[in-house]
A protein has these predicted regions:
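Short secondary-structure boundary micro-motifs
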Residues: 6-7, 163-164, 173, 219-221, ...
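Extended, compositionally biased low-complexity polar/Lys-Gly-rich tracts
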Residues: 103-123, 130-136, 140, 172-183, ...
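Outer membrane beta-barrel transmembrane domains
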Residues: 188-193, 199-341
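A subset of solvent-exposed loop/turn segments in beta-rich extracellular surface proteins, enriched
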Residues: 1-166, 210-215, 269, 311-313, ...
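Secondary-structure transition into beta-strands, especially the periplasmic turns and strand N-termini
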Residues: 25-32, 121-132, 182-191, 240-245, ...
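Loop-centered beta-sheet repeat module
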Residues: 139-209
Length: 341
């Protein structure tokens, strides 16, 4: 991740585990689903400000320093309001530092989620069936945040220690989703609105005392609060008459923001097949693109093995060079198990 930050100016990691349980009964006339999910994410990026630099002024200050007797030369040489040089004649070296409010910002979250969903058949006819449902999600979040000005970094190891030992703040919230699904013989259409109530969570404070820029201060204050944006999700699927082949499309009608502050709005297209094989009962291929934020596109492939193991992997089409090696900008990997009892 640090190598990615070096090349791209930011780095991000995400990990999740999910355990859904479907209770197949007709209590209150529908189906109940209970799930537990854990996810963690972290990101480091630069908060940059333009450096004020006048070449003629810097040249004059440097010349004045050279014209001063060595014994009277100051240890620090500011060549602009934002740049300070530290000459080390004994080591034949010159150190450079930026003194404006450009910073490195790190954020991380750990989320435990409990969800309870209920769906029921609202209408049935010759052309298909309409299902309605709702879901409540209880979130327990641990949030951490650190911001350090580049000019205040004197020891990179101390900085990484501070990042690793950042304090977490605990926060809780409840989200509500509603949805509708129309199912026919050869197709289905669905719509879901997530986080209708838009629950909010608060990151810890960061030390604003060293900051002078109003823009940097306002950004860090606004960045303290994370809101789960309301989002409309649409989906559609078509099937062959024997349901061995299928195609699926999913579309987020608007963008939303994740805890790291990145926007996402996914468009997904996939196709799948099923067989009578016990070893490999189904397979799938897919394409997904983030229409907001990073604008990254992914291609993926997945299989179901032994009728209960789901394995999927996806890779971004865009690449980045790290230490001379070309790598995809993003990789997704998923391993799941489905068991009925």
């Amino acid at each position: 991740m640090l190598a990615l930050i070096k090349e791209e100016g930011y780095g991000k990691a995400w990990l999740a585990a999910d355990a859904p349980f479907v209770i197949d009964n007709n209590y209150l006339g529908g189906t109940w689903t209970f799930g537990v999910n854990w996810s963690g994410s972290s990101k480091a990026y630069g908060l940059t400000q333009a450096i004020e630099f006048d070449k003629d002024e810097a040249s004059q200050r440097l010349q004045d320093w050279l014209d001063t007797l060595p014994i009277n030369r100051p240890a620090l040489l500011p060549i602009s309001n934002d740049i300070v040089l530290t000459p080390q004649p004994g080591q034949n070296a010159l150190f450079f530092s930026v003194t404006n409010d450009s910073s490195i910002v790190t954020k991380s979250t750990q989320t435990t989620e409990f969800d309870l969903a209920y769906s029921f058949p609202a209408w049935s006819g010759d052309t298909g069936n309409l299902y309605l449902g709702a879901e409540a999600r209880l979130y327990f979040m641990r949030l951490s945040r650190l911001s350090v000005r580049f000019g205040d970094v004197t020891d990179s190891e101390e900085l990484f220690d501070a990042i690793r030992h950042s304090e977490f703040r605990n926060d809780e919230g409840v989200g509500v989703d509603v949805g509708a699904l129309w199912v026919s013989d050869n197709y289905q259409l669905g719509a879901q609105i997530t986080n209708i109530n838009e629950p909010g969570f608060v990151f810890p404070d960061v030390n604003l005392e060293p900051y002078k820029s109003e823009g940097a201060i306002n950004f860090l204050l606004a960045d303290q609060r994370y809101t789960m944006d309301r989002q409309l999700k649409l989906e559609g699927s078509i099937f062959t008459s024997d349901r061995r082949w299928s195609a699926h499309v999913g579309y987020d009608a608007d963008s939303a923001t994740d805890p790291m502050g990145d926007q996402f709005q996914w468009l997904t297209v996939s196709g799948g097949f099923t067989t009578d094989s016990w070893w490999l009962p189904s397979g799938r291929i897919g394409y997904r693109q983030n229409l907001a934020g990073t604008k990254l596109s992914y291609v993926g492939i997945g299989v179901t093995a032994f009728k209960f193991v789901n394995l999927d992997i996806a890779s971004a089409l865009d690449t980045v060079r790290i230490d001379g090696t070309t790598l995809p900008q993003g990789v997704m990997f998923s391993l799941g198990f489905q068991i009925a009892w």
